Structures are given as structure tokens and as C-alpha cells.
Amino acid sequence: MLDITVKHIDELERYIGAFRKGQRFFYAGKSLGLSKLGMNAIRMPKHWEHYPEHDHAADDEEELYIPLEGSGTLHAEGQTYPMHRGVLIRVGAATRRKIVPGPESMTLLMLSDRPDSK
């Protein structure tokens, strides 16, 4: 028997919690039944400034950011990195980062080595 799960991003379970209004955060990995990989998705409106600056030093979680739609900028410890479709960005656990969408809304897929990632 095939072990395949297919879902559109709009079918994923939504997270409703500490994030600020304007964004939509999805439990992608949980919705797809992933058990060995953390995966979430977020849709942010243009120029949205409320993505929290954070790191994952306490839980030693590295992240991979994959922009699906739109564009933005990753800010990390005084450096900036353009984010747009086709670009993959890995960020180590101890690096503080913040993401700001550009002049259009941005949909971002986030992968990690922790299945329980939020």
C-alpha cells in the first residue's frame, strides 16, 4: 500500500497563538504526518514587521527557509540576505534571525531537524 499524503497549503492545520495578526502559520509537517522532520509554512503580508527575531540555541534546532511565493529579506546579526523563489537559506541554531517580506506578500516553507518544531 502506498504511504503518500498530498495537501494544498490551505488545507494544512493552522496555528493560532503567539504570532501577531496579519500572518497565517501552518503546521505543515504535522498535517502531512511527518515524524522525522519539522516543517511549517507561513504566509506574511507585504512589509509585515512582526515576524519575531529569534534563535534556536536552547533546542539546537537549525532551520532551512524556502520561499515559495513573493520575496523578502532575512536579517541576521547585522547582515541581510535576499529571499525569493529558488533561494534556499540554512540558518544555524545559535544565529538570531528575523524575516521581513518585501513589497508583496510572502509564503515561506521552513524545515528543521525537529519534528515538533513551531
What are these regions (language model features)?
Residues D60-T73, E77:
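Glycine- and acidic-residue-biased ligand/ion/polar-headgroup-sensing regions
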Residues F25, A41-D59:
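Conserved short histidine dyad/triad with adjacent acidic residue
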Residues G33-S35, H75-Q79, G102:
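Short strand-coil-strand connectors
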Residues G33, A93-S117:
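Ligand-binding loop in jelly-roll beta-barrel domains
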Residues G78-A93:
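Short acidic-glycine-tyrosine-enriched beta hairpin
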Residues N40-I42, Y65, L109:
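Conserved hydrophobic/aromatic positions in well-ordered beta-strands
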Residues M1-G38, P45-K46, K118:
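A short, N-terminal "cap"/entry segment at the start of jelly-roll beta-barrel domains
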